[in-house]
């Protein structure tokens, strides 16, 4: 009986220790996946951005939100998750498939999905019962509006090659910012279960 209690205590300590939290540690793998996704987006370039200058648009990336220090840990996690989810949704469409090299697009979608799955292990413990409440908060709404603007732009431009190129460049900016946000979360302790 003493052995079982010792084992249970060890498991509890490991789950709340610096390397534990039952899988909610923002790993280096998550950062590597993020960098690989940026590399894939760069490789997806089919047109010179200079040839699409007439189609440029400021989508209003909420930079201060993803790069500033104004968000608390749970909010930052929600913003990161929403940015990755919306990026995945943007590239995981029929219209997107018609615009890009299929192999690179599949690799990008797989990479984004992997990041989301890695974050999903933390979503429940970090969000708990606050999930529905946080889903309505201003930063999440801002991210959703940002991506709605991108979808509207593509539709307005009839999903032209230049429109997709402008969006590709914009998504490189957005995912680069989300990588900065991931790094900030990691520096906050990395352990998303910690109070």
From Swiss-Prot:
Keyword Cell inner membrane part of the UniProt annotation: no
Keywords, ordered alphabetically: Antiviral defense, Cytokine, Disulfide bond, Glycoprotein, Hormone, Pregnancy, Secreted, Signal
Glycosylation, residue list: 101
Domain of life where this protein originates: Eukaryota
GO biological process: defense response to virus; female pregnancy
Other comments on record: IFN-tau genes are intronless. They evolved from IFN-omega genes in the ruminantia suborder and have continued to duplicate independently in different lineages of the ruminantia. They code for proteins very similar in sequence but with different biological potency and pattern of expression.
Function noted in UniProt: Paracrine hormone primarily responsible for maternal recognition of pregnancy. Interacts with endometrial receptors, probably type I interferon receptors, and blocks estrogen receptor expression, preventing the estrogen-induced increase in oxytocin receptor expression in the endometrium. This results in the suppression of the pulsatile endometrial release of the luteolytic hormone prostaglandin F2-alpha, hindering the regression of the corpus luteum (luteolysis) and therefore a return to ovarian cyclicity.
Name the UniProt record assigns to this protein: Interferon tau-11
